[in-house]
A protein has these predicted regions:
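Extended substrate/RNA-proximal surfaces in nucleic-acid metabolism proteins
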Residues: 1-53, 100-112, 121-134
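Hydrophobic faces of well-ordered beta-strands that scaffold small-molecule active sites
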Residues: 29-31, 55-57, 79-83
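Short basic/hydrophobic patches in alpha-helices and adjacent helix-turn junctions
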Residues: 71-74, 78, 99, 103
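Short, motif-level signal for alpha-helix interfacial/capping segments enriched in acidic residues
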Residues: 9-11, 59-76, 125
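Active-site beta-loop-alpha junctions enriched in small/polar residues
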Residues: 1-4, 33-36, 58-62, 84-88, ...
Length: 134
């Protein structure tokens, strides 16, 4: 709904915001990547891999990632599963994620939140105690 130039400008601004957030704050997971705020997925995933940030594979919003699957996998980033369940009947339902993993040959050792693999998160105690410095 906007010009190509405007779209590219928005993608650049959004991408820079994601990169800055990962550098400045103890981010653990990027959720809904490319769902509403379009970004350069490859660049964001490369930074996420570098910073130890998971990228969510969201049951409801996988369509936003389909065309970027190869770049995401090639970046080396780890993934975490999210069902986006807004209904208790949908909790734990990951069939679309399983299909995505199979379709794009996502290495299962890099997918957390399934197969009993729990993600690990950064300790935020020091960050919280020193938040005024940020």
């Amino acid at each position: 709904f906007c010009s190509q130039k405007k779209r590219e400008s928005l993608i650049d601004k959004n991408t820079r915001a994601y990169l800055l957030a990962m550098d400045k704050f103890p981010v653990d997971v990027i959720a809904h990547l490319n769902h509403r705020a379009l970004v350069d997925v490859k660049t964001v995933c490369e930074k996420a891999q570098e910073r130890g940030v998971y990228v969510e594979l969201n049951e409801k919003h996988l369509d936003a990632l389909e065309r970027y699957a190869k770049d995401m996998i090639d970046s080396g980033v780890n993934f975490v599963v999210g069902t986006d369940a807004h209904d208790t009947k949908k909790l734990g339902k990951t069939s679309k994620i399983e299909d995505f993993i199979a379709k794009y040959d996502v290495p299962r050792d890099r997918v957390f939140g399934i197969d009993g693999k729990k993600p690990t998160f950064k300790d935020k105690k020091d960050w919280i105690e020193n938040a005024n410095e940020f």
